[in-house]
C-alpha cells in the first residue's frame, strides 16, 4: 500500500512535533539540521523547503508551545476580576505545574526543558515565551489583584511604592517562579529536591505561600480556598 503523502501544513506540523523533543533534550545550539530531518523522517532538503533556517523552525515551536490558543485563557476572559478569581488562578497555575496528570506532564516537560536550554544559551526563546505569557495572562492576574486590594483582601507590600505599577506584574512572576521551579525539580523523573508531602499537599502549601507573598490575608485565603477548591472555575482538559 502506497504511503500517504502529507500536504504542506501536515508536513510542517510533523517536523515541528519531531523537533520539540530534540530541542528540549539538546537545546537550539546542540541540535543539528541533520538530526531534525532524521527525526521527522525526511531529507534535509525537504526540511529546508518548509523551514529555510533552524531559527524559523524554533520560532514556529515558540508559537505553538506558548499560550496562544490555550483554552484556559478563554475561560479566564469570562471570569470576573475578584479575589476568588485571583485565588483560583494561583491554585490552577500551581496545580498545573506541580500535580498535573501524565498528559499535562508530557506537554509541560518539553516546554520547561526548552526554557532551561534557552536560558543557558542566548535567552531568546525564554524571553519571547515570557513576553507572550505577559501579554496574554498578566492582564487577567493584575485585574483580579487590583480587585482584591479594593476589597481589602490584599495589603500591597511596602516595596510596591518603589516599583510603582510594576509591583503587580512582579507578583505574578514571583508566583510563576515558585510553581515552575517545583516542576523543574521533577524533570529527572523524580524530585531532586526533598520536598515533604505528596504533590497535592505541595499544591496547597505553594499556593498559600504565593498568596501570602502577594499580601493576601489568611482569612481571605481560607475563605476562597474553602469556597472553591477547584481553581476558581478554571478547568483543564482532564477535568
Predicted regions and their residues:
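Secondary-structure edge/capping motif, primarily at the C-terminal ends of alpha-helices
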Residues: 76, 119, 186-190
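Helical hydrophobic small-molecule/effector-binding pocket
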Residues: 67, 83-127, 138-142, 179, ...
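Hydrophobic alpha-helical connector segments
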Residues: 60, 73-110, 158-168, 203
Amino acid at each position: 500500500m502506497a504511503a500517504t503523502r502529507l500536504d504542506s501544513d501536515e508536513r510542517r506540523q510533523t517536523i515541528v512535533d519531531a523537533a520539540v523533543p530534540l530541542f528540549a533534550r539538546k537545546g537550539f545550539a546542540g541540535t543539528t539540521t541533520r538530526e531534525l530531518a532524521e527525526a521527522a523522517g525526511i531529507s534535509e532538503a525537504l526540511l529546508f523547503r518548509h523551514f529555510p533556517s533552524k531559527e524559523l523552525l524554533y520560532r514556529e515551536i515558540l508559537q505553538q508551545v506558548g499560550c496562544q490558543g490555550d483554552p484556559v485563557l478563554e475561560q479566564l476572559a469570562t471570569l470576573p476580576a475578584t479575589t476568588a478569581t485571583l485565588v483560583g488562578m494561583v491554585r490552577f497555575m500551581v496545580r498545573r505545574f506541580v500535580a498535573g496528570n501524565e498528559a499535562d506532564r508530557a506537554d509541560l516537560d518539553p516546554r520547561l526543558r526548552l526554557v532551561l536550554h534557552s536560558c543557558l544559551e542566548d535567552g531568546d526563546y525564554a524571553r519571547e515565551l515570557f513576553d507572550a505569557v505577559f501579554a496574554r495572562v498578566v492582564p487577567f492576574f493584575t485585574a483580579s489583584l487590583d480587585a482584591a486590594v479594593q476589597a481589602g483582601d490584599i495589603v500591597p507590600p511596602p516595596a510596591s511604592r518603589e516599583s510603582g505599577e510594576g509591583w503587580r506584574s512582579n507578583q505574578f512572576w514571583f508566583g510563576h517562579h515558585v510553581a515552575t521551579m517545583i516542576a523543574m525539580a521533577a524533570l529527572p523523573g523524580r524530585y531532586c529536591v526533598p520536598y515533604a508531602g505528596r504533590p497535592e499537599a505541595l499544591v496547597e502549601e505553594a499556593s498559600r505561600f504565593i498568596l501570602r507573598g502577594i499580601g493576601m490575608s489568611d482569612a481571605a485565603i481560607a475563605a476562597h480556598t474553602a469556597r472553591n477548591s477547584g481553581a476558581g472555575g478554571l478547568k483543564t482538559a482532564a477535568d
